[in-house]
């Protein structure tokens, strides 16, 4: 169900979020 998907997406974001943010900020400040 969508709750399982949400849980998976939440866990993925917790893991990948910080590095994605760093990449976006790094690209924006160049």
From Swiss-Prot:
InterPro entries xref list: Poneritoxin (IPR010002)
Q: Which Pfam families match?
A: Ponericin
Where located?
Secreted
Identify the domain of life: Eukaryota
Query: Transmembrane as a keyword?
Result: no
GO BP annotations of the record are: defense response to bacterium
Q: Which key words tag this protein in UniProt?
A: Antibiotic, Antimicrobial, Secreted
Could you tell me in which tissues this protein is expressed? Expressed by the venom gland.
Write out the GO cellular component annotations.
extracellular region
Q: What does this protein do?
A: Has activity against some Gram-positive bacteria and S.cerevisiae. Has a non-hemolytic activity.
Family, according to the entry, reads as follows: Belongs to the ponericin-G family.
Q: What is this protein called?
A: U1-poneritoxin-Ni3d
In its UniProt entry, the species of origin is given as Neoponera inversa (Ant)
């Amino acid at each position: 169900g969508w709750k399982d998907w949400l849980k998976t997406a939440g866990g993925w974001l917790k893991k990948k979020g910080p590095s994605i943010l760093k990449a976006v900020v790094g690209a924006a400040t160049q």
